[in-house]
């Protein structure tokens, strides 16, 4: 059991002070001012106790948040793993699933993309389920709608990779150019981008992200864990190994 020594010292200091007050006057009861002065003097002598208190609070919040997230993952596993509207890259029957919430305009999402690709190349038992989460503005929404529309033409993976490689904001013109490069039907793509079905997918993804406690992109779900931020290949492999038996 971890003991917070500064707070133990504060308790001892207060007991000593109270003992002195009672020695001077057996009927004396420490006043609010007496207690405040003791605490103030102690904190001035031990300022590190404030930092320790903040760190302890943050760690407690982190653990509680992780526990809530783990429970939410279990309760929403079907939406995470079996939603037919979520594009998948890798063998659809692969035993290990990684769910990624991402935004095409997110720099860290772009940074981790080559790592995700390498992971899929080296680990054929892994599939990545993509949850479009456009949180960074109109260009993000445009890109996500285009990617989901491209999925209807069987071209999600190449369109996804090209969107992540776009230099600068993702505009309607950029999407038209990518559509032409991949030989897709532009008129159909535009129709699907504006369809209620695509809009509903994005709304559903946002609600799911909120339920799980996703606060940033990229965020990954591996097993029962929600992991925010970009990771290197070794970290992905560690998490896969840790969760492969679940």
Which residue stretches match the model-derived regions?
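C-terminal cap of thioredoxin/glutaredoxin-like
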Residues: 5, 24-40, 60, 177-246
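A short beta-strand-turn-helix
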Residues: 78-96, 120-121
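Structural alpha/beta surface segment adjacent to cysteine/selenocysteine redox centers
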Residues: 99, 104-105, 110-185, 190, ...
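A generic local structural motif
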Residues: 83-87, 114-115, 206-207
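Gly/lys/ser-thr-rich phosphate-binding loops in alpha/beta enzymes
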Residues: 2-24, 93-122
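Flexible, active-site-adjacent loop/turn segments at secondary-structure boundaries
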Residues: 41-42, 47, 79, 86-87, ...
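Extracytoplasmic/secreted proteins, especially bacterial periplasmic and envelope-associated proteins
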Residues: 34, 38, 45, 49-52, ...
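N-terminal targeting signals for export/organelle localization
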Residues: 2-3, 12, 16-78
